[in-house]
Amino acid sequence: MSKTLNDNLKEYKVSEIPHIRLMGRNVKGALKSGGPVPLFWGAACLDVRAKSGEVWALVETDYSVYEVWACVWVNGRIISRFMLEKGRNWVCLCRGFAPETVNDVRIMRDSQAMCEDPDQIFLVHSFAIEKNGAFLPLKEKKLRIEFVGDSVTSGEGLYGAVDETQWISAWISPSKTYAVKAAEAMDAEFSLVSACGWGIVAAWNNNIECVIPPIYGQVCGLCKGEPQQNLGSCKEFDFDEKPNDFVFVNLGANDYGAFFNEPWIHGGKEYKMHTNPDGSFDEADCMKVSCGIRDFLKVIRKNNPQAKICWVWDMLEMPELSTYMHKGVSMYIAESGDKNVDIRLLPPSSLEKEDEDKGSRNHPGPLTHKLAAAKIIEYCKNTLGYSK
């Protein structure tokens, strides 16, 4: 990383680049604002197609607790991943190519959106290429897919040794998730709306405020810090600007975990998903999950009137709650008459036998994400009538 730019390079603000693609939720008109572009969610990214021997990006980050990680893609493959320093710095995305080489280059946020750090931001100000280089048109993507989820969709556990237990930014890698793998295979634009520990009606620790449905309509509503809100995190998101073709929801694992954890105390009141004396799940609390699924599907459909919606789960197995997950989707379909909603169970992490296949922090590893991506791809192709 560098504070200055080499003399052989020319800087272009994001708004000055004629051909550039932004993926991941953002404020309306972010590419043409004249200012830096924030990357709010995990796997949010900027793509350029550059004729140049090297490509740089001017980025800016800040944080108080959890640093931001980024990764670089060249021609569809990740070539580097690194922790970003605080402040504004030039980052070399790639170099050493012949000047006439044309590369598809992507800089991606490889950290999830962090509600735990109200100061955390990631901005891209500019790109730089050789003075005789050029930005060329990008190939249009065929589809748009949104993935809504928790730590699995955020990529927790996809870096680090199997026995790692500390919760740090380094172990979270959205770029390696089933979601990004599936979207790339489908040649789709993608966006992730996901946060570790968050649920449908309860977070992993029974916190009823760390749930996705209430913030779904916002750009990145879980980030409520002043610098984050100044960038537009809590603004209403414009779903019509780029309508989704598919919305996959992978939530429920933290609601499941809440049954095994201590109550959350807030305002003198106790919140808890209960188990019975025999260890079974309390029926009323299970029904809270079913009703939460039904109600959230109404919100998703309202904002995505034409999309195929599919609720998926089981990468982290939750046998006691699975019936109620099914029930929630069935309740929505029965009440709405919406036939454009499906359920799919994804391969569980219990299939991982070798350390190289496993993730850190007791989360799904590379094998499970690969198998889950294959299921998503198969579902998309079947829905669209693609031949295998």
Sequence positions of predicted segments:
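N-terminal secretory targeting modules
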Residues: M1-P174, K388
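Conserved SGNH/GDSL esterase-like catalytic core that processes O-acyl groups on lipids
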Residues: W41-A43, L158, E164-D282, L316-T323, ...
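Surface-exposed acidic, glycine-flexible loop patches that form ligand/cofactor-binding
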Residues: L136-L138, L231-P243, K298-N304, T383-K388
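Structural recognition of the beta-strand scaffold that forms the well-ordered cores
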Residues: R144-V148, T153, F190-S194, D245-N250, ...
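Extracytoplasmic/secreted proteins, especially bacterial periplasmic and envelope-associated proteins
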Residues: T177, K181, A284, K288, ...
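A structural motif corresponding to the C-terminal end of an alpha-helix
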Residues: A179-E189, F296-K308, Y332-D338
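Active-site segments of SGNH/GDSL-like serine hydrolases
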Residues: A253-D255, W264, I293-G328
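Catalytic His-Asp segment of secreted/periplasmic serine-dependent ester chemistry enzymes
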Residues: I265, D314-K388
